[in-house]
Amino acid sequence: MGGPRALLAALWALEAAGTAALRIGAFNIQSFGDSKVSDPACGSIIAKILAGYDLALVQEVRDPDLSAVSALMEQINSVSEHEYSFVSSQPLGRDQYKEMYLFVYRKDAVSVVDTYLYPDPEDVFSREPFVVKFSAPGTGERAPPLPSRRALTPPPLPAAAQNLVLIPLHAAPHQAVAEIDALYDVYLDVIDKWGTDDMLFLGDFNADCSYVRAQDWAAIRLRSSEVFKWLIPDSADTTVGNSDCAYDRIVACGARLRRSLKPQSATVHDFQEEFGLDQTQALAISDHFPVEVTLKFHR
């Protein structure tokens, strides 16, 4: 997967569609499983939301046999003119409660190159990141040298196509500070493993209100380092209910990726307003809104 022919096909598809952009979202769909996807109202709206993205992370997937995911993919492919596929993690969690990370992607826009589950040597994460490398249109410029644990042997740089690495996190609320900080260690691990720093960290970080307070940010390396650009501001509200919290975030790094960010495209996707739902109807879908960003690429 992800070879020159696949990349060329993706570029042709983007050219034919009259766009050179990649819309990426992250959606915590509360307790996603068979009952939610089989509900006609919920299932159809979820499918339409995800079909609006070229690449989307879904969290809180509770579907070990992938029956709900299979049904979801059928619904997405029935409402979209493009064909979608998926890649998912194993069920993750420290106790009997498990969740999966799910990436849904448009096959003519990106392809999966490689995946791995972060080993989490310090056991910081309740649900360790399932890291996925996608092939995407390149920006054509060579990136500067990357930081690495192996100071004397910098990792190799991608020679042609840009590889876009997505790192998901659904943080345990009361461990959010430690888990968000530990994403910096994931960043170093990806550089050592794959030799690229073009990464998006995304998901429900629980990064606001009582879980991450203003005084906590200084201890979070992912926030204090200038390497990372936080795209969803602290002032955002990513919750459907009456709270006002910026739980869901997208963080970018890598010179080429940061140059590819479409200005002002990072936003909260208010599906309640989009579909004309009342709060009860919206909460039946999820207690979180998706967050998103668009990457633009040179033709």
From Swiss-Prot:
Per UniProt, the keywords (alphabetical) are:
Calcium, Cytoplasm, Disulfide bond, Endonuclease, Hydrolase, Magnesium, Metal-binding, Nuclease, Secreted, Signal
**CC cofactor:** Mg(2+); Ca(2+)
- Relate the protein's function as given in its record: Divalent cation-dependent acid DNA endonuclease involved in the breakdown of the nucleus during corneocyte formation of epidermal keratinocytes. May play an immune role by eliminating harmful DNA released into the extracellular environment by damaged epidermal cells.
Q: Which Gene3D superfamilies does its entry note?
A: Endonuclease/exonuclease/phosphatase (3.60.10.10)
Superkingdom as given in the UniProt entry: Eukaryota
Q: Which family does it belong to?
A: Belongs to the DNase I family.
Q: Which gene encodes it?
A: DNASE1L2
Extract one GO molecular function annotation from the record. Answer: DNA nuclease activity
Enzyme class label:
hydrolase
Q: Where in the cell is it found?
A: Cytoplasm; Secreted
Tissue specificity, per the record, is: Preferentially expressed in the skin and up-regulated during keratinocytes differentiation. Highly abundant (at protein level) in the stratum granulosum.
PANTHER family xref list: DEOXYRIBONUCLEASE, DEOXYRIBONUCLEASE-1-LIKE 2
Q: Where are the bilayer-spanning segments?
A: none
Keyword Magnesium among record annotations = yes
The cysteines joined by S-S bonds are C209-C245
Tell me which positions the record assigns to the signal sequence.
Answer: 1-20
The residues annotated as the active site are E99, H170
Annotated Gene Ontology cellular component terms? cytoplasm; extracellular region; nucleus
Full protein name: Deoxyribonuclease-1-like 2
